[in-house]
A protein has these predicted regions:
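Phosphate-interaction motifs
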Residues: 2-101
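Conserved small/polar residues in nucleotide/adenosyl-binding loops
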Residues: 102-108
Length: 108
């Protein structure tokens, strides 16, 4: 069986292409508890969504965060809507959040 050799950069780029091509991951709603919620001077919001023993890193850019109707904080239950993509530098996938809602405001 032949093996394909990749540099780390090539492999991360390939995985990014695969995730970007997946329509399901292009528009998802993920529910969980906010953790490590931080707003940076750039206006970008970074947080982790947790559910049971799982976690998902998330980012909400300033342009999307401007439409928030509440002040998010760690410990809140929310629904995050956005797309899953790879951050190639770190080789890690995350949710690029475009909308964040209290779980009670989200559709089941």
């Amino acid at each position: 069986m032949a093996r394909t050799s990749f540099t780390v950069t090539e492999l991360n780029a390939h995985i990014k292409q695969l995730l970007d091509a997946d329509a399901l991951l292009g528009n998802v709603c993920v529910t969980g508890e906010l953790s490590n919620y931080k707003v940076y001077p750039s206006g970008h919001h970074y947080f982790t969504l947790k559910y049971a023993e799982s976690s998902l890193r998330c980012v909400m850019f300033r342009s999307s965060a401007q439409s928030l109707r509440f002040r998010p904080a760690s410990g809140m239950s929310v629904a995050a809507i956005g797309r899953i993509a790879v951050y190639p530098r770190d080789g890690a996938y995350q949710l690029y959040c475009t909308c964040l809602l209290y779980t009670s405001d989200a559709a089941d």
